[in-house]
Each structure stands twice: as C-alpha cells, then as structure tokens.
C-alpha cells in the first residue's frame, strides 16, 4: 500500500511556513499530542472537498482529548507563491477551525510524504502522528468520510477514527515527558 514506507518512522518537521490560522507550530511543539496532518488544496479538488467535513468532525470530537488537526495547503498543479487571502478564503469555505499553514514550495509535502513514498498516487494525503512523533497511520489520498461517495471512503474514515482513538489512549512514554 502506498504509505507503508513511512509507517513506524519518525515524522520529519515540516519547517517554516506562513500560518493563516493558528500557529506557528512545529512537530516538536506538538509532542505529547496526536497530530493529524492533511495536505489539501482548493475546493475544486473533489478529495479535499469530500474530506473537509471529516477533518472538522474529527477536530471537534477529538480535539478536547488531545488530537491536533493541522491543514497544510499545497497549491496545485505545482508549487507556487500563494496569497494568504486566497488560502484564508479556502479555509473559510471548508469551515476549518484548526491550524492551517501554507506550503507554497511543497517542502512539507516533500519531507513528510513525496520524498518518502515514491509510489504516492495522491498529494491530498493524511498522516497520523503519535505522541512521540512517529507516523502510525496513513491515508494515502482520496477521500475519507463517514458518508463518503463509496465504500472505500467510508472504510477509510472508520480506519482513521479507530487509529485516532487508539493513539489517544496510548501514553507518550518517558522520552516525551
């Protein structure tokens, strides 16, 4: 499966980015929390549009328990400088209430995903990082939603939700305290 190469591996930090909501944050800042990173683009992307309500729901439901959802806007079809207002408009259209950064040059997308997963079929992907900073679950792209357009999207949502619940129940361990 695309994404297996990153499972069980430390997540590299995403570097310096402009934050349009929340932030600035680094993975080091979030140690001790479960982090769901979603790479997304404009509402024209059907996968991004289809997954946005799920991100909002997971943030609403599990945020108080220690889940931090982080949106990483990646311009398409290729890296380009993106006006903050444009990204803010997308964030508003999606209804995001969690931290969102602009990854103009795709450096975070490359560090966390593309450089580590040579067979990646999607850029609209999600990584679930545990309290110690280890990638523990990957949604390699497309949509995950409880009321998704197909059986796979619904299964992927349930798998993400179950992984979040499992990681929230784990302790961070002595190295992170």
List PLM regions with ranges.
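Short active-site neighborhood of thiol/selenol oxidoreductases, capturing the structured segment around
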Residues: 25-49, 55, 69
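Structural microenvironment flanking redox-active thiols in thiol-disulfide oxidoreductases
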Residues: 49-94, 105-111
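Thiol-/selenol-based redox modules, centered on thioredoxin-like
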Residues: 122-177
């Amino acid at each position: 499966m695309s994404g297996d190469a990153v499972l069980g591996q430390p997540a590299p930090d995403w570097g310096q980015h402009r934050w349009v909501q929340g932030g600035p944050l680094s993975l080091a800042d979030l140690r001790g929390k479960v982090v769901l990173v979603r790479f997304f683009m404009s509402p024209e992307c059907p996968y991004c549009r289809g997954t946005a309500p799920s991100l909002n729901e997971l943030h609403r439901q599990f945020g108080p328990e220690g889940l931090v959802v982080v949106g990483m806007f990646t311009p398409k079809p290729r890296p380009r400088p993106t006006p903050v207002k444009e990204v803010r408009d997308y964030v508003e259209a999606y209804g995001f209430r969690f931290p969102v950064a602009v990854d103009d040059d795709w450096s975070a997308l490359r560090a966390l995903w593309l450089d580590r997963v040579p067979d990646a079929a999607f850029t609209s992907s999600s990584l679930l990082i545990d309290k110690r900073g280890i990638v523990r679950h990957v949604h390699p792209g497309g949509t995950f939603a409880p009321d998704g357009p197909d059986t796979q999207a619904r299964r992927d949502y349930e798998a993400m939700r179950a992984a979040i619940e499992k990681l929230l129940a784990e302790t961070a361990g002595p190295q992170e305290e």
